[in-house]
Amino acid sequence: MRPSTASTPLSSSALNYLESFERNAKALRGNNNGSSTSGGNKKDESSTSKSIVSSPAPVKRRVSISDIISQARRQVSLSRTDSEDFDFLNESLKSSVFDESVSSDTDSEESHEEKRILPLGTPGQQVGRKSLKDIRELRNSIDQSLIKPPELKMLRSKAAGEESKRHAHFESIQEEEKISEDLPTAQLPSKSPFKKAIQSGSESSDSDSIIFDEVFEEVLPSPPRKPAPARTAPIVVEKKIEKPAVKEQKARKKKEKTPTPTESSFESSSDSSSTSESSTSSESSSSASESESESKSESQVSSSKTSTSKASSSKAYGSDFESEKSSSSSASTISKVTPKKLDKPQKTKKPDKKRAKPDDIRQNKKPEPIPYEDFIPKLSSRSSNSEKSTVRETNRTLEESLKKTLKINKSSEKMEKPRKDIRRAPRSSSSSSSTLRDAEREQDIERRREKRARRFRSRRRRSEEPHTCQENIHNMIESVIDTHVQMLDDFNRMEYAAVCEWTQVLRKFDGHDGPSSQKLREIIERRLNRKY
């Protein structure tokens, strides 16, 4: 029924609109058929039979919509520019199809021919019942579909969904990036010392608002190595022993100074005497000489203290050899200080106070042998295991032992000279008891020297055994071979014991000859001759 697009000036939307009207008309036709059957049930059977007989051949027939559409198309083809006729057709269609008086109850009693808009009996196109509201909804949906087709809607919704998904994906990525960026920024200000100053907004640099402990907890350098206690202990012992001697000399000085003003006051009151003046002058000169000697000894002690402090600081950062040199040198300086302190007061003091001197000498002499034992390097695990030691350890032990022997010999030679001076002084001044004590001390010192000499000899023997890398490697290979040989010996012993046991079993079975004994012999021979 559709003409070609070239002959019709109507647009595709208008043609679709007309086709929709045809569909609505067919729907109304089915609706009218249903209403006629419902109205016929109320009437008598005679009237229904008459209507059924008269329905296939009606007297007057209304024009169908299909006829109207065909007429409209013909008119449009004849007069293409007449738009008024098209408007009239639309109005007539609207008034005929969408008339509300059709569905009213008052018109149900009228004849079916007047009611019927569309003719019955259109073949093969019976549509179910539909009310006018449904038809209007269909029409509105068709109009909306002409304005906005559903395909575009679906496409737009899909595109919008994809865009929204992409947008959400990008937002999630941005949030993750923000979180990852926020994490380090949250950690950094906790460690920064300027956090509180920045938060408070104070322009002045307050020392209270800046906490430097947070920063320098991790950056603090590791403390230097503490020096070995065996090397520093003897120096401290001598310092402690030297202090009481200095205090005693100061106390004596005060005692000697106190009578001088009293004597001078008595002399001024009595106006007599050159003798008392000479005594006071001699006492003052002796006190002056004592003060000078004390100042010298104190300066020497302070210098020795500084040297020991330098030695202890050098121990932390220097090598072991330097620390040993410094300890031996500090020991020699302290030993030099002690005899000077003891010799000078002897010349200045009077012979009445000579009896008190040996006690001071004993106090200073008692601790003297202590530091030399401590300065002797003790036998370490290195020297005891030097035969099986590695290359580095053997070389170190050699160098250390040789240097230590040289240093200790020098220090012992230096220390012998002041000891001889100290021995001479008490012999000339002290009693027989002091000489006995000195003899005992000398014997103890000689014994200690002998012990030291024995130790040095044993060390030299041990250190002289491995000299070169080649010998060290040779010793290592020998030890490895020894272990392997021991393992092989153990294995051979076990194997021999097993063979002996099996041979004893065989000898026992030799007395019982038979088929079972022969089988056992074969099995035992197989097991003994098995190649592992």
UniProtKB/Swiss-Prot annotation:
<protein>
    <recommendedName>
        <fullName>Uncharacterized protein F59B10.2</fullName>
    </recommendedName>
</protein>
<feature type="compositionally biased region" description="Basic and acidic residues">
    <location>
        <begin position="357"/>
        <end position="368"/>
    </location>
</feature>
<feature type="compositionally biased region" description="Basic and acidic residues">
    <location>
        <begin position="157"/>
        <end position="181"/>
    </location>
</feature>
<feature type="compositionally biased region" description="Low complexity">
    <location>
        <begin position="198"/>
        <end position="213"/>
    </location>
</feature>
<feature type="compositionally biased region" description="Basic and acidic residues">
    <location>
        <begin position="410"/>
        <end position="419"/>
    </location>
</feature>
<feature type="compositionally biased region" description="Basic residues">
    <location>
        <begin position="347"/>
        <end position="356"/>
    </location>
</feature>
<feature type="compositionally biased region" description="Polar residues">
    <location>
        <begin position="67"/>
        <end position="80"/>
    </location>
</feature>
<feature type="compositionally biased region" description="Basic residues">
    <location>
        <begin position="449"/>
        <end position="461"/>
    </location>
</feature>
<feature type="compositionally biased region" description="Low complexity">
    <location>
        <begin position="30"/>
        <end position="40"/>
    </location>
</feature>
<feature type="compositionally biased region" description="Basic and acidic residues">
    <location>
        <begin position="437"/>
        <end position="448"/>
    </location>
</feature>
<feature type="region of interest" description="Disordered">
    <location>
        <begin position="157"/>
        <end position="470"/>
    </location>
</feature>
<feature type="compositionally biased region" description="Basic and acidic residues">
    <location>
        <begin position="237"/>
        <end position="249"/>
    </location>
</feature>
<feature type="compositionally biased region" description="Low complexity">
    <location>
        <begin position="326"/>
        <end position="335"/>
    </location>
</feature>
<feature type="region of interest" description="Disordered">
    <location>
        <begin position="97"/>
        <end position="129"/>
    </location>
</feature>
<feature type="compositionally biased region" description="Low complexity">
    <location>
        <begin position="298"/>
        <end position="315"/>
    </location>
</feature>
<feature type="region of interest" description="Disordered">
    <location>
        <begin position="26"/>
        <end position="84"/>
    </location>
</feature>
<feature type="compositionally biased region" description="Basic and acidic residues">
    <location>
        <begin position="389"/>
        <end position="403"/>
    </location>
</feature>
<feature type="compositionally biased region" description="Low complexity">
    <location>
        <begin position="259"/>
        <end position="290"/>
    </location>
</feature>
